[in-house]
Amino acid sequence: MTRGRCAMLAALLWGCAAPVSPCGTGPVPVDLRGSWHYEGTQSSPSTATLSGTLRITSQPGQDFYGDLSVTETDVGSGSARDLSGAVTGCALDAASVDFGALFTVEAAARRHLGTVKMDVTMDSITNGTWVESGPSGPIASGTFKSARQSGP
């Protein structure tokens, strides 16, 4: 099984549970506060691209809070819709994050599982998978990446 398929399987299995928050009051393992450029793809049920801004406004310990605003564009039809909502998550350690984005037009949160990497200029890059689950299982899924635009 490829690394990507393993990550997607993990996201699908974990997607049925609520995001891990509150996750702890320990020290901040990685400072995520700031504004992030968010890019994503949706692979099911239809193909779409997502582009926008993830803002982490508060991080008391491992928990973090903010909002996500994106434009989702259907690859087939070209139709676009704006999505925005609250973000609640957890910095599991210095290299892993788990967060949910609850868009105001959707009934279920999109759960994101990602890795955080710091490059030589200390700009954080996050990559991972997301899944939106409903009562009968996964509704939509895809991948995402974020690069910090500004921060503390």
Question: Predicted segment positions?
Answer:
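N-terminal helix-cap/turn-to-beta initiation motif at the start of protein domains
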Residues: 21-37, 57-61, 122, 149-152
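Acidic, glycine-rich flexible loop segments
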Residues: 91-124, 129-134
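Edge beta-strand at a domain terminus
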Residues: 20-24, 54, 80-88, 125-152
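Sec-dependent bacterial lipoprotein signal peptides
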Residues: 1-18
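Short, solvent-exposed aromatic-acidic interface loops
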Residues: 42-44, 67-77, 103-107, 130-139
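Amphipathic hydrophobic-ligand
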Residues: 46-51, 77-84, 108-117, 138-145
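Tryptophan-anchored aromatic micro-motifs
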Residues: 27-50, 126-130
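N-terminal glycine/threonine-rich, aromatic-flanked beta-hairpin/loop signature
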Residues: 46-90
